[in-house]
Amino acid sequence: MASPDLLFNLRNLFYLGAYQAAINNSDVPGLDADAAAERDAIVFRSYVALGSYQLVISEIDSSAATSLQAVKLLALYLSGDKESAIVSLKEWLSDSAVGSNPVLRLIAGIIFMHEQDYTEALKHTHSGGTLDLHALNVQIFIKMHRSDYAEKQLKIMQQIDEDHTLTQLANAWLDIAVGGSKIREAYLIFQDFAEKYPMTGMVLNGKAVCCMHMGSFDEAETLLLEALNKDAKDPETLANLIVCNLHLGKPSSRYLSQLKLSHPDHVLVKRAVSAEDNFERALQAVA
């Protein structure tokens, strides 16, 4: 008989965006060395997701496991030390002793996806090996507008574990990317998460995006305001509220100002700044 998966609940909390809950519930007894290392990686990735980059950088020293060193590189990268993080990352990846570590490959994929260097990201993630890597492949292929390749990755995940939270999440992401009648299926996946697990900003945003695709902007706004109450600085919540309010004919400048302050590199901020610059140039040309 298979031994129980002691990290099942912890992983689910992390995957669904309940990062503080994952940290609070990380004291799991009876873990062997490998499971303890995975637990530590989840905890530090949760701190990264909450923006506590310096805590991660200071607490993971040079003697830590490869998986934790990888998470530290992600914290360095997101804290603004991008060039140094990428140089170190490439050194680690070229080291035959640790370069194949699945967490290191996952972090490489995440960092290069942030860089919008999807070819480089896939170089490290395409061979898969874990559900996390396959799920990241789905995200990368969606970013590349290759839903056909994303679907192949999803099918591999479904063969491994169709009911796994990551498989269901990847299914929802792909359904939203494909659109049309698939949006309803994505909505039902997020609804299922909402019924089974504590409601998180990620699940609320997922439901809200589906609602917007289906034209239910009032329901989407209600969900997004609930998400905003959970985290007033979450970039996806703010970005989705901007889009939702534009469709509802409501002012969205306050949310855009918040997004500019907390996440100046967000794609929506860059588009808004570019539009403002173009408008200024047009005014000057007329003047």
From Swiss-Prot:
GO terms for molecular function: structural molecule activity. The keyword Protein transport applies. InterPro entries: Coatomer_esu, TPR-like_helical_dom_sf. It is a peripheral membrane protein. Keywords: Cytoplasm, Cytoplasmic vesicle, ER-Golgi transport, Golgi apparatus, Membrane, Protein transport, Transport. Signal peptide: none annotated. GO terms for biological process: endoplasmic reticulum to Golgi vesicle-mediated transport; intra-Golgi vesicle-mediated transport; protein transport; retrograde vesicle-mediated transport, Golgi to endoplasmic reticulum. It is found in: Cytoplasm; Golgi apparatus membrane; Cytoplasmic vesicle, COPI-coated vesicle membrane. Pfam families: Coatomer_E (PF04733). Its main location: cytoplasm. GO terms for cellular component: COPI vesicle coat; Golgi membrane. The coatomer is a cytosolic protein complex that binds to dilysine motifs and reversibly associates with Golgi non-clathrin-coated vesicles, which further mediate biosynthetic protein transport from the ER, via the Golgi up to the trans Golgi network. The coatomer complex is required for budding from Golgi membranes, and is essential for the retrograde Golgi-to-ER transport of dilysine-tagged proteins. PANTHER family: COATOMER SUBUNIT EPSILON (PTHR10805:SF0). Belongs to the COPE family. Oligomeric complex that consists of at least the alpha, beta, beta', gamma, delta, epsilon and zeta subunits. This is Coatomer subunit epsilon-1. The lineage of its organism: Eukaryota, Viridiplantae, Streptophyta, Embryophyta, Tracheophyta.
